[in-house]
Amino acid sequence: PGRSVAVNSGRRALEYILRRLGDVRCVRVPLYTCRTVVETMERLGIPVITYRIDERLEPEELPELEKGEYLLYTNYFGIKEKCVDRLASRYGGSLIVDNALALYSPARSGVASLYSPRKFSGLPDGGIAVMDAERSLPEPEERDESLPAAAFLLECLEHGQERASAACERNERR
């Protein structure tokens, strides 16, 4: 279910989703999440409200969401499928699923999801935004450059892994 758009990174997939949703007043994000998730929202001027998760990696409390509020849930390592299903039933289009660590998790009807294939494959970058849409999603208005992200692979081939390690680390931090 849903249509997808390929972008350059998981953070760009999240940005694409947030821009397509339109009037996003705030997003509730788990405390245990990648810093790039919060940085993406800050860059877009979207307020972030954090929530706690329990030892099962599930929200301690399920908030009531008002119009323009969204809940971002991280499908940790792809092991939280039942929780994603429960949240999708409760929140529908107000749920954004972060499947950056769950490449093989199916998209849910009516729910936006983001994926980061590079975390599962030998790819220097890559992201996928999935949204439930009646028609094809438009291409992103702007794209990141992929060349800087892939340069360390060529450096590794030509000069060895040791010499390319600093470039690889820079790619991971971007």
Name each model feature, range by range.
Residues G2-V5, G10, T33, I53, ...:
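PLP-dependent aminotransferase class I/II
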Residues R3, R12-R90:
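PLP-dependent aminotransferase-like
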Residues S4-A6, V48-T50, L95, S113-L114:
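Conserved beta-strand scaffold positions in the cores of enzyme catalytic domains, especially
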Residues L14, V27, V97, I128-A129, ...:
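Generic low-polarity alpha-helical segments
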Residues R28, T50, G122-G127, E162-E169:
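Short, Lys/Arg-enriched charge-dense amphipathic segments
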Residues D54-A151:
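Active-site phosphate-binding strand-loop segment of PLP-dependent enzymes
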